[in-house]
């Protein structure tokens, strides 16, 4: 036994782990197998990490909040300067604007991820990004107010609200505020911030400065652009290209971009009092006694006039705590020459010493300075498109104020989804096209008798189960849980651009919609008492009818839950450019790939499942069901592992797990595979990477085994119906 006896230390996993931390780090499955499928993103933000309990209703709590009292407390905080982190110019407003901006500004329109909707600035990596230096202090300054109001206001809402109050206390009229951002309690795992492994790395570019999708920042750890210019090159014209690219990826046009930069830089200053070598580790790397505060500086006092944040030392205007048009007055009022901050960062000053003594010091009333600008500020003057807009704003300050108010509201609410999700007394009445408006219900809804009648009409229409299910799926599955856009409500599948997307098979879609519109017209004409059915409802109902019939074909009578209340959006309520970003490049649920991508198809499936807020079991049962319902793009038979298509059986799993089948790639690309009889070599099935991953990946195989078991058919049908219903209702915020 002597050679096998374990010492106490070896047996004690805690002690062993502690020793391990001193010599190295524990190896995760992903360290061993870098291509390991990242299924954990389907299970983030579960109840196990949430301290609030299953009965907690944030919307209800927020509605009970005295918002005016919160704003009064925030207004008092703005000028309550603390010795441990004194306010520039005696006002914390500019710091809080930066906090709110950097909370919301991580949003990118490409996949809807990022943004301020979940309070992620509290967690890694955002809490430790180089662009967020010293925002930890802003949140600590807010803690007494958060502590006072507790569960009634989330950190996510409080950070955005504080940015609004900051502006209002400095004389700016904001456009409004909508609450409803519910906090999460762990870092997001689904957001791809880039492949770089060093701060400020920029391996995200290829070719002629082509930025990788869906990224919306030029370097790892920045919110947008490098203020010194591309890679620190102080070229305002080149910087303008970066600005235009990343702001567009945040869904901002040129006018909104100029308004945001100029409006934001009406306030406050940047901080570059000394070399960055004086700055200590970021919050996530700081010592335990720092209690989550980072970037402790050894330069002078480390605060006040000695603060080092981004390295630039720029104060844009002579009125840094008062709303004005002085940013443009100063930008156009001087000729500029390149200089460096005390930290060594490139910035600009007026030529010939002009403007000396016109800018106040942030902490010493006896000191005065010259104006200064960043390279990216000068982009607004020297890029010809930006210059025209900037000149217009300079000459029309009222237009700047309105454009900035609207752009700021869009910046801080873009990831919240439809206006129906906004809470509180300051929600603006105006409906904005980027909110993807849908008309309010203006008619009596169909009842159970009507639903049964319409199902019968649909099933007798000549449309196949595959057509009914596919159409409902492509309508509903545009939903993104990230920014709450897309979904079946609005029936935008019949409008540009969605009606022409390849994934929707436009010719077949038009046939299905024409048939359903005929049924809709017939019903609405015959109905009395103002009762109507919207096409949005009818599309979903048709899919539900198809699923019910498929279950019946498999020997099971089920009723798929259906709740009417969707409405049909108009083309003029649909921003074509914005909606184009929702076009799927892949839909593994229908075995669709628009092109070959660097990421394998199975990763794209998981990504879409995450955007649909699906769990791994829900993803699994939906793929298995969609295959046997014959819903593949182009009617391919890849993954249709059944002899009874359009019957809701568990055949996909039974046949995938059949050890009598051997799988072989048909080409070196390894995207299509043939399943051959091990004995005869006869080809039985064909499948894609998405199909085979449910037998290859150990976690997904475990789930497939559940649904492929002899006693699993009824469970499979029930679970498919539940997951299907979830997808159909993802955008039904009116039901919450």
Swiss-Prot record:
Cited InterPro entries: Catalase_peroxidase, Haem_peroxidase, Haem_peroxidase_sf, Peroxidases_AS, Peroxidases_heam-ligand_BS
UniProt PTM comment: Formation of the three residue Trp-Tyr-Met cross-link is important for the catalase, but not the peroxidase activity of the enzyme.
Any idea of its EC number? 1.11.1.21
Give the position(s) of the covalent cross-link described as Tryptophyl-tyrosyl-methioninium (Tyr-Met) (with W-101).
Answer: 224-250
In this chain, the stretch annotated as Disordered covers 1-30, 351-373
User: Which cofactor(s) does the record list?
Assistant: heme b
Q: Kindly state which keywords UniProt assigns to this record, in alphabetical order.
A: Heme, Hydrogen peroxide, Iron, Metal-binding, Oxidoreductase, Peroxidase
Note the site residues: Transition state stabilizer: 98
- What's noted on cofactor binding? Binds 1 heme b (iron(II)-protoporphyrin IX) group per dimer.
Q: What Gene Ontology cellular component terms go with this record? A: cytosol
Reactions catalysed, as given in the entry: H2O2 + AH2 = A + 2 H2O; 2 H2O2 = O2 + 2 H2O
List ligand-binding residues for heme b. Answer: 265
Q: Which domain of life is it from?
A: Archaea
Family in the record: Belongs to the peroxidase family. Peroxidase/catalase subfamily.
* Protein name per Swiss-Prot or TrEMBL: Catalase-peroxidase
**What lineage does the source organism belong to?**
Archaea, Methanobacteriati, Methanobacteriota, Stenosarchaea group, Methanomicrobia
């Amino acid at each position: 036994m002597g050679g096998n006896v374990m010492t106490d230390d070896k047996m004690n996993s805690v002690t062993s782990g502690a020793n391990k931390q001193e010599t190295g780090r524990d190896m995760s499955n992903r360290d061993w197998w870098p291509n390991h499928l990242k299924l954990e993103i389907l299970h983030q933000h579960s109840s196990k990490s949430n301290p609030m309990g299953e009965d907690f209703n944030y919307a209800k709590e927020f509605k009970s909040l005295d918002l005016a009292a919160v704003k009064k407390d925030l207004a008092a905080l703005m000028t309550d300067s603390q010795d441990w982190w004194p306010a520039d110019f005696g006002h914390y407003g500019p710091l809080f604007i930066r906090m709110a901006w950097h909370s919301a500004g991580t949003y990118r329109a490409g996949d809807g991820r990022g943004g301020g909707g979940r309070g992620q600035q509290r967690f890694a990596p955002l809490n430790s990004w180089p662009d967020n230096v010293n925002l930890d202090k802003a949140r600590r300054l807010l803690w007494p107010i958060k502590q006072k109001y507790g569960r009634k206001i989330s950190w996510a809402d409080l950070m955005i609200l504080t940015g609004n109050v900051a502006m209002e206390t400095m004389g700016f009229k904001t456009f409004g505020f909508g609450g409803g951002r519910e906090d999460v309690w762990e870092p997001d795992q689904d957001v791809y911030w880039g492949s770089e492994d060093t701060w400020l790395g920029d391996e995200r570019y290829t070719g002629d400065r082509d930025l990788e999708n869906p990224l919306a920042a030029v370097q790892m750890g920045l919110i947008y652009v490098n203020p010194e210019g591309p890679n620190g090159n102080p070229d305002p014209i080149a910087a303008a290209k970066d600005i235009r690219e990343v702001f567009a990826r945040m869904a901002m046009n040129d006018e909104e971009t100029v308004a945001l930069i100029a409006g934001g830089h009406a306030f406050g200053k940047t901080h570059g009092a000394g070399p960055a070598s004086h700055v200590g580790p970021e919050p996530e790397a700081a010592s335990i006694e720092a209690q989550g505060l980072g970037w402790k500086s050894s330069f002078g006092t480390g605060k006040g006039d000695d603060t080092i944040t981004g390295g630039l030392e720029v104060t844009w205007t002579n009125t840094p705590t008062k709303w004005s048009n002085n940013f443009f007055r100063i930008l156009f009022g001087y000729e500029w020459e390149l200089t460096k901050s005390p930290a060594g960062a490139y910035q600009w000053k007026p030529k010939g010493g002009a403007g000396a003594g016109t800018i106040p010091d942030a902490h010493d009333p006896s000191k005065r300075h010259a104006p200064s600008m960043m390279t990216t500020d000068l982009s607004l003057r020297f890029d010809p498109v930006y210059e025209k807009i900037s000149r217009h704003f300079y000459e029309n300050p009222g237009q700047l104020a309105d454009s900035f108010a609207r752009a700021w509201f869009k910046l801080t609410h873009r990831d919240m989804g439809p206006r129906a999700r906004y809470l509180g007394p300051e929600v603006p009445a105006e409906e904005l096209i980027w909110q993807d408006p849908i008309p309010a219900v203006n008619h009596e809804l169909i009842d159970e008798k009507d639903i049964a009648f319409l199902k019968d009409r649909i099933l007798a229409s000549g449309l196949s189960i595959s057509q009914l299910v596919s159409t409902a799926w492509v309508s509903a599955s545009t939903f993104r849980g990230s920014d709450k856009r897309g979904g079946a409500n609005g029936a935008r599948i019949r409008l540009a651009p969605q009606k022409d997307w390849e994934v929707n098979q436009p010719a077949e879609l038009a046939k299905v919609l024409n048939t359903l519109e005929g049924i809709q017209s017939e019903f609405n004409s015959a109905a009395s008492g103002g009762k109507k059915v919207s096409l949005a409802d009818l599309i979903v109902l048709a899919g539900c009818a198809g699923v019910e019939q498929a279950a019946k074909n498999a020997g099971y009578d089920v009723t798929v839950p259906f709740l009417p209340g969707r409405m049909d959006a108009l083309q003029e309520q649909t921003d074509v450019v914005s909606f184009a970003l929702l076009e799927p490049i892949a839909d593994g649920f229908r075995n669709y790939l628009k092109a070959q991508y660097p990421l394998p198809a199975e990763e794209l499936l998981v990504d879409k499942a995450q955007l649909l807020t699906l769990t791994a079991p829900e993803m699994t049962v939906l793929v298995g069901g969609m295959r046997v319902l014959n819903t593949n793009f182009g009617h391919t038979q890849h993954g249709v592992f059944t002899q009874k298509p359009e019957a809701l059986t568990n055949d996909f799993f039974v046949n995938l797990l059949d050890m009598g089948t051997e799988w072989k790639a048909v080409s070196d690309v390894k995207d299509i595979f043939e399943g051959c009889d091990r004995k005869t070599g006869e080809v039985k099935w064909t499948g894609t990477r998405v199909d085979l991953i449910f037998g290859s990946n150990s976690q997904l195989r475990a789930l497939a085994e559940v649904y492929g078991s002899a006693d699993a058919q009824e469970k499979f049908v029930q679970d498919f119906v539940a997951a299907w219903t979830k997808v159909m209702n993802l955008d039904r915020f009116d039901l919450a």
